[in-house]
Amino acid sequence: MQTVHEMLRRAVSRVPHRWAIVDAARSTFDICRTGETSRNEGSATARLWPQPARPLAVVSGNSVEAVIAVLALHRLQAVPALMNPRLKPAEISELVARGEMARAVVANDAGVMEAIRTRVPSVCVLALDDLVSGSRVPEVAGKSLPPPPCEPEQAGFVFYTSGTTGLPKGAVIPQRAAESRVLFMATQAGLRHGSHNVVLGLMPLYHTIGFFAVLVAAMAFDGTYVVVEEFDAGNVLKLIERERVTAMFATPTHLDALTTAVEQAGARLESLEHVTFAGATMPDTVLERVNRFIPGEKVNIYGTTEAMNSLYMRAVRIAGTVMRPGFFSEVRIVRVGGDVDDGCPTVKRASWRWRRRMRPFQATLTNLRLLQKSFRKAGTGRAICVRDGSGNIVVLGRVDDMIISGGENIHPSEVERILAAAPGVAEVVVIGVKDERWGQSVVACVVLQPGASASAERLDAFCRASALADFKRPRRYVFLDELPKSAMNKVLRRQLMQHVSATSSAAVVPAPAVKQRTYAPSGRAIAR
């Protein structure tokens, strides 16, 4: 077992002068200097954070300073609780209060700092720049800090979910889980150990992927981490070419924008060897463009938060929902009452020995440990899947996203995949809204391409001409300028449902010409 500190300490001994971090301004830290900086900063900060093994809020986006701060706090035996700076100040302060944190480091946002001080006056709040000042970290005389404890079950880091269904929930990552969260980039994504690795830091550090699978993997594999503070497709394209990036982890939204930039610039990106994506369903049209304009092996990852990586598929050339179980996990396809045969759509449960531990709002770390066994027994069954005889698993969607209309199960991804190919459609999300007669009604929320035009009637005709079953056609269309999304580019479906339920501007299309079955409580079919 290796902690994050141990993995980076060994990398220092192997390649002491390798550039570990590079940012857009071409500021560089070699791996040895990064280790020394975090060690010195940890010593300098010890007076402010004398409580090892306690969670401590870190509110920051991607930056060299954020990397140094998190590594220093980890070196200091604190438990960095990384938070999304795009959350509202009131939400961040509430997370600090409910997490019972006594310290917070904030990336120079006066509003957030004031909100924390107001909500929890006892919290010591420090600006990130006051903790870390680039290369001007003060040298500290005296004895060096002892190595961080290596108790397997001790909390190492806290990450928060994307908050698609409300205030984000904390996930505590124990020390023993760090190594596997890095190594899966080798076992599933094909990343090889060596100083040839130049990894693009596109994913946010406050997400488990952005921290473990991108930052720590790049440095622990003796490579270089290229910081991306703000995503702009044109600037990222230039950064990839300038730094000769060999690997990147991105969301479908990132890749969609990047393929457009590559096409417009006529770039080739010949240095890219590995492209891994997750965070949302990959539309077929975007996947085709990714394979056309972006080189390197493509890997689709599913389940990075709940079970580190429960499913994946390498050499992706077709619809991105056909996947296989990952090296560190086993998958059962179940329903209430037991397992099911291959070919039947039902719920996936992933088992992973070092699965995350859920952190309830009011729970302390002690209470958290008491919940660990029950969480392991519960599994992480949230995906509707079909497994074929070869062991391939097709992810149809999430259990809580499934629409039940007139007794029929409708998976949003089935409808979204059809509509995504319609002329003029840039993005589409299908949701179910309450319907007095049918329980739920299918609604398509559509973002059009710049300059494009479309109507509910045209999109409905497109669905009628497709292979989509008639009862699955959307009954309403809502045209939006943009979709509400989290920092991981996941659509915030609850916000979308609230918006659609409150609006009367949705275009309504005719009911289907064919009959749809619905079911009475007795189980007898009723013609629709």
Swiss-Prot record:
Transmembrane segments: none
Listed GO biological process terms: fatty acid metabolic process
Cofactor: Mg(2+)
PROSITE patterns assigned: AMP_BINDING (PS00455)
GO molecular function: 4-chlorobenzoate-CoA ligase activity; ATP binding; medium-chain fatty acid-CoA ligase activity
UniProt keyword ATP-binding present: yes
Binding site residues for ATP: 161-169, 300-305, 409
Enzyme category, top tier: ligase
Thermal dependence summary for this entry: Optimum temperature is 35 degrees Celsius.
InterPro entries attached to this UniProt entry: AMP-bd_C (IPR025110), AMP-bd_C_sf (IPR045851), AMP-binding_CS (IPR020845), AMP-dep_synth/lig_dom (IPR000873)
Regulation: Unaffected by 5,5'-dithiobis-(2-nitrobenzoic acid), 4-chloromercuribenzoate and sodium azide. Inhibited by Cu(2+), Fe(2+) and Zn(2+). Unaffected by Na(+), K(+) and Li(+).
Pathway: Xenobiotic degradation; 4-chlorobenzoate degradation; 4-hydroxybenzoate from 4-chlorobenzoate: step 2/3
General function of this protein: Catalyzes the formation of chlorobenzoyl-CoA via a 2 step reaction. First 4-chlorobenzoyl is adenylated by ATP, followed by acyl transfer from the 4-chlorobenzoyl-AMP intermediate to CoA. Benzoate, 4-bromobenzoate, 4-iodobenzoate and 4-methylbenzoate also act as substrates. Inactive towards 4-aminobenzoate, 4-hydroxybenzoate, 2-aminobenzoate, 2,3-dihydroxybenzoate, 4-coumarate and the aliphatic carboxylic acids palmate, caproate, laurate and butyrate. Negligible activity is detected when ATP is replaced by UTP, CTP or GTP as cosubstrate.
Name of the protein this chain belongs to: 4-chlorobenzoate--CoA ligase
Taxonomic path: Bacteria, Pseudomonadati, Pseudomonadota
